[in-house]
């Protein structure tokens, strides 16, 4: 295709009065869920994954809502936020500056396995069974990312670069700070009591601990 129109607005840095440019890098938050879902659907197209299958078909460590141990969680339920997986306290507590220090697999297993660092039956799951109701779940998309890793035997960031970013010529897109030129990154700000509060420069990529800019991917 051909780009018909492109324009940037606003400031990349307020202190330096630096305008936003067409090549300025930005944190995209939950928009990254689009890439996770695309990776899942690619695997479905290849016949490597069944959307209606129990996710434990593909995971090395099983995940079940302890209140409904006999009800499987499906891939489709993760995609549609109906899995009964809840963003517990560990979700917010695990935000950190910079690239992740533990793997996605290690974090997810710590969240869902009894005895794990982040395991909490009430915090991590809803009372209703999988498929019963819609409830937005960032952690659920983290599980989808782990499904991609388990099936392809590649880190999510590597799979998406090879099969999504590179084919689409998205050469300045990535999950990790180490994948991009941070000098081209807009300076992030918090919005607090009508004031723009600058985040620490070292927190350019305010990422969720397990290898994904996100679950607010």
Stretches with model-predicted labels:
Residues 39-44, 59, 79-86:
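Generic hydrophobic/packing signal
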Residues 1, 25-55, 141-149:
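Active-site SXXK
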